[in-house]
Amino acid sequence: MNSNPFTKNLQNVTDPSDWEPTKLPNLKELDSLQRCYICKEFLKAPVITSCNHTFCSHCIREYLIVNSHCPLCKAEQFESNLKRVILLEEIVLCFSKFRPILLELLKKEESNEAYDKNRSPFSEIPSKDEDSRKRSSPDQEVIEISSDESNSLELSEASNDVPKKKIKAEINSNSRNAIPTRNEMVECPICAEVMSADLLQTQHIDYCLSGKSQPSSSRSAGNSSSRYQSMKRRQPNKTNNGISSFFKPADNKPIMAGAGKLDLSKTDNQNFYFDEVSKHHHNDIKKLPKLDFSSLTTPKLKEKLSHLKLPVQGTRIQLELRYNQYYILFNSNLDSNHPLSEKVLKQKLNQWELSHSAFTNQGSTSTLFNNGSPAVKSITDKNFSVKEWLDANRNEYKSLVKAARASIKKASTKNVTSSISIDTEAINTHSVGGQHLNERSEYRSEANLIEPIDDGASEEIQQNEISNLNFKKDIANSPLFVKDTLNESHS
């Protein structure tokens, strides 16, 4: 036996593809249209957005905590624009109640048709051995018939001209006309006589209560129903439920397993929508407001939770998560036609906390539904807190600054030793001499004689030395300087 809880839960998962093996596979389209785009389940407390798309109230509110657009069309959405769809919720509830019955009926009819096609034409005529087995079976119900019918049966069996199939059909039709079906027969609560419900309610009950004799018409009807007594004798005794027992059959077995679990008398979706209009709105209960956690101190947040009779222990992130989740549960519950009590909502909140990593693992920094956390907010948000961001990433910034300073020092030492040197081969191709070349060589020698910058020197001294070297290097590499030098040497 598999004890995996996920396997057990999968057995209760419904999907539009369940209709494919039935006689009406196109019903999967109706099934899928009644499901939420986010959770893929049947719509619960459906709400419609300003862009005319419908989702579960819980799903879309949870989605809009982090996002600000419609999941389908990406149009901008606000939680305040969500509207209830009362009729759609009742339609979905009604369909989900009858869904298992429809599936079973369609599959059952399909299997019966396949069975009828595979049956041979001679399978309807039972053999003598089968007849004897059926007669000797203890579960087989025996129906006694009148002497006239038995004589006609013997005569028909004596003659071989009439086939058995025809005889069987005649007997079945006669017995059906003579004896009402079991569902049509009821028992008188006074004299315990079995008869039809119409006869009991119109004539028999009055005579039975007054103690008078039954009229001839009712007697004849009662005599025809007395043939049902043999069936009753072979059935187990049942307790008499009183006068209300004749409003329903004594033995009312469900047609299918799914129908036995469903009380069809409680499918009052139509009554709720048309008659119980006062239950459509919950004006006396206000929805919870959305909090701006960046402007709330921890004591203030705990005060808000305490006012809602919610736990106040935990870290700051846990407190924010707790409020957000209860905010979603509470407001989506008000969108339902059949809201739950606050006690049930708090039980759901407790179950959510037990399954959430931010509450089960200490020190976890999960940011699910945490719109107050800087990790969730965008840097372009008007409520973005720079101080919180700096505090959360202070250590990372320090390491980046340290690495940047080290790379600057390495780059400065390389520039002093290598990038200041000038390619002398290009200048020597020209017959350059004289005083300007000596001055140029002095600039180069002065640049090469400068010692590397000490690591312990201050940044101001380093910047001054580097700027002086760059200035001299620019003069030495200046094309005007080289041009003047060449002109003077040629002259």
Swiss-Prot record:
Highest taxon above the source species: Eukaryota
Task of the protein: E3 RING-finger protein, member of the UBC2/RAD6 epistasis group. Associates to the E2 ubiquitin conjugating enzyme UBC2/RAD6 to form the UBC2-RAD18 ubiquitin ligase complex involved in postreplicative repair (PRR) of damaged DNA.
UniProt family annotation: Belongs to the RAD18 family.
Listed GO biological process terms: postreplication repair; protein monoubiquitination
Protein's name in the database: Postreplication repair E3 ubiquitin-protein ligase RAD18
SMART domains: RING, SAP, ZnF_Rad18
Source species of the chain: Debaryomyces hansenii (strain ATCC 36239 / CBS 767 / BCRC 21394 / JCM 1990 / NBRC 0083 / IGC 2968)
Zinc finger residue extent: RING-type: 36-74
This protein's pathway: Protein modification; protein ubiquitination
Any GO molecular function: zinc ion binding
Positions of the SAP domain: 293-327
Taxonomic classification: Eukaryota, Fungi, Dikarya, Ascomycota, Saccharomycotina
